[in-house]
Amino acid sequence: MPARKRPTPEGTVTARQTLLDGLARDADILELVSELAPLHPRDNTFPGEVFLHLAADALDWCGASQADPLPLEGLRERFLPECTFRGRQNTKLQYAVLAAAALHGGTEPDLLDEVAWWQTDDLWQYALFTAVAYIRAAASRAGVPVCHVCQDLAQRPGHPAP
């Protein structure tokens, strides 16, 4: 991959901030996908890692833990009502949801091994949907507006570029 197409620290910051700013202003998810698409190098998981770490940060923000778990049942229906997933799309979303939870729990999922069988270049989109769902769920759990969670998460340092 040419150097100009590799993820950069600036791209990581931009991806994180663009998603948080978009959610804070209640932007349409598909609008965010279009806005963030130029950051995604072909045949690369970036910025998926950024969004999975952001989702894990949202779990941390709302205090989800083994002692006080965030229920996943109904997560998609409650927090991504504008999205419709069918067949393998459900499996991809489930993987991203569980990968973010694994990051929150202190493990590092093998994204490349997983997405190799997908035969598509869309992990980053499912990671984005996951971040949106977890941020909305965190806001619901805390009883605060989504923009409040986004503002708090924006103050936290992001994770380095992959």
Which residues does each PLM region occupy?
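Solvent-exposed interaction surfaces and binding hotspots enriched for charged
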Residues: M1-P162
